[in-house]
């Protein structure tokens, strides 16, 4: 029920002006009244990520009237976080981001219950995500976005006529920032464009938050970036000269140490080409960009929970390089998307092309890391410490022509840690 406590009523006066009054921007079924604020306070909402964007989101949601919030993040607090992730203090360094952020918000906003989960999003199953009415992502990783996107699509049930059941849809609000640019979008799984529908919007990631590369590296790029921004300044090699990404001796020094760090965390893929590419570009996090995008995401959550206004349709761009500028565009759903539309993807390959060339194409198109390819009768490529028996055959297959591996029309199953579900390709030898 809505609180009758005079102090609580005064605290939410501004929000009640939106929920208790009529509006020209309302959705057609909106009816002014106290029930809207009650619905807001009873909405269960999940925030994924408690970093720069996540801290802003938690603060905004709690101060907007949401009372049941959960936050999930696998990272711990690093000293580099303290300049912009304002829910953390120096004494919190080394502690769980999710747990510290949840405790801070609960202490400052009376009546707001924030539950922390210090784990990977992949550690939670369907029953966990199904209990939420809205999920907001404040992630710095494309694979993580794709995973939760696939999970929410899987939660949508079909009715007898094959159409998605609207009652099983959990809206996803996704926010992202990079330097002075950011975006926010609202996704209705299987109804509007999902993350994979617009995967071309995301270039290969080359900019990484320091907290990630220092504490929980997950990509080869994380290892290289760590050597660049942490190890080089500390060790001051070559008599303390500045790192020159065009100097092959400097690049080799970084490559050797990045390879050792990658080996420590069981990460593959550190090579000279990638090292050179990462060394030449880094964009710092900007607190004001996080604030703007988090505010936009929180506003969309407020609209979804109360129906006081229509959500954006459906992708907001923001930039503050030369003044502040925003625009909203409507992303179209891809009817051939393997995640939200289902089905099998026809994939043309040359009969004389090799399996290695196919893997490169798939990795670039779908942002894969270490894909495994298999037909219904055999594994074509699988490099895994859990299945060493396939390694030699996989290496031999890399240089084998596709016509010698599969027949025209045969299906290949592609799995990868970046995917929440396997891709099914119908090979067309042309």
From Swiss-Prot:
Pathway stated in the Swiss-Prot or TrEMBL entry: Protein modification; protein neddylation
A Pfam family that the UniProt record links to this protein: E2_bind
Which GO molecular function annotations are given, in alphabetical order? ATP binding; NEDD8 activating enzyme activity
Leader sequence residues: none
Q: Its catalytic activity?
A: ATP + [NEDD8 protein] + [E1 NEDD8-activating enzyme]-L-cysteine = AMP + diphosphate + [E1 NEDD8-activating enzyme]-S-[NEDD8 protein]-yl-L-cysteine
Q: Name one GO cellular component term.
A: nucleus
Please list every transmembrane segment annotated in the UniProt record, as residue ranges.
none
- Asked if the keyword Acetylation belongs to this entry, the reply reads no
Q: Ligase: present as a keyword of the record?
A: yes
The EC number(s) given in the record are: 6.2.1.64
Keywords, ordered alphabetically: ATP-binding, Cytoplasm, Developmental protein, Ligase, Nucleotide-binding, Nucleus, Ubl conjugation pathway
Catalytic site residues? 211 (glycyl thioester intermediate)
The compartments listed are: Nucleus; Cytoplasm
Amino-acid positions noted as binding ATP in the UniProt annotation, renumbered to this chain? 52-76
Q: Name one GO biological process term.
A: protein neddylation
Q: Write out the tissue specificity statement of the associated record.
A: Expressed in intestine, vulva epithelium and head and tail neurons.
Phenotype of the disruptant? RNAi-mediated knockdown results in temperature-sensitive embryonic lethality.
PROSITE patterns xref list: UBIQUITIN_ACTIVAT_2
Q: SUPFAM superfamilies, from UniProt?
A: Activating enzymes of the ubiquitin-like proteins (SSF69572)
Subunit comment for this entry? Heterodimer of uba-3 and ula-1. Interacts with NEDD8 and ubc-12.
Q: Which family does it belong to?
A: Belongs to the ubiquitin-activating E1 family. UBA3 subfamily.
According to its UniProt entry, what is the function of this protein? Catalytic subunit of the dimeric rfl-1 (uba-3)-ula-1 E1 enzyme. E1 activates NEDD8 by first adenylating its C-terminal glycine residue with ATP, thereafter linking this residue to the side chain of the catalytic cysteine, yielding a NEDD8-uba-3 thioester and free AMP. E1 finally transfers NEDD8 to the catalytic cysteine of ubc-12. Required for cytokinesis and mitotic spindle orientation during early embryogenesis.
Protein name, as recorded: NEDD8-activating enzyme E1 catalytic subunit
Organism, by scientific name, is Caenorhabditis elegans
Organism classification = Eukaryota, Metazoa, Ecdysozoa, Nematoda, Chromadorea
